From Swiss-Prot:
Keyword annotations from UniProtKB, A to Z: Cleavage on pair of basic residues, Disulfide bond, Knottin, Secreted, Signal, Toxin
Protein name per the record: Conotoxin S6.10
UniProt signal peptide: 1-22
Homology family: Belongs to the conotoxin O1 superfamily.
Gene Ontology molecular-function annotations: ion channel inhibitor activity; toxin activity
Protein source organism: Conus striatus
Compartment(s) where it occurs, according to its Swiss-Prot or TrEMBL record: Secreted
Length: 86
């Protein structure tokens, strides 16, 4: 009888500990897998500025060059290749 009570209390204690730790680890995470996959897709897509658009750094331009004088994206190769092709 004492052993049964000890086992029941131990199981309840371990279950409570497991639920408490599972709750703290899941904070800030989304519950639905579909939402998680769309968040990853949004983070992976990179928006860039087309030719003749304003820029401050070369990485912002879809083309290969940001003119530091005019702060405009230009295709310095003159053949219309974007970064994804290069």
């Amino acid at each position: 009888m004492k052993l049964t009570c000890v086992l029941i209390i131990a199981v309840l204690f371990l279950t409570a500990c497991q639920l408490a730790t599972a709750k703290t680890y899941s904070k800030g995470r989304q519950k639905h897998r579909a939402l998680r996959s769309t968040d990853k897709n949004i983070k992976l897509t990179r928006r860039c500025t087309p030719d003749d658009g304003a820029c401050a750094e070369p990485v912002q331009c879809c083309s290969t060059f940001c003119n530091p004088v005019t702060n405009m994206c230009i295709d310095w190769l003159g053949i219309g290749l974007s970064r994804s092709v290069l």
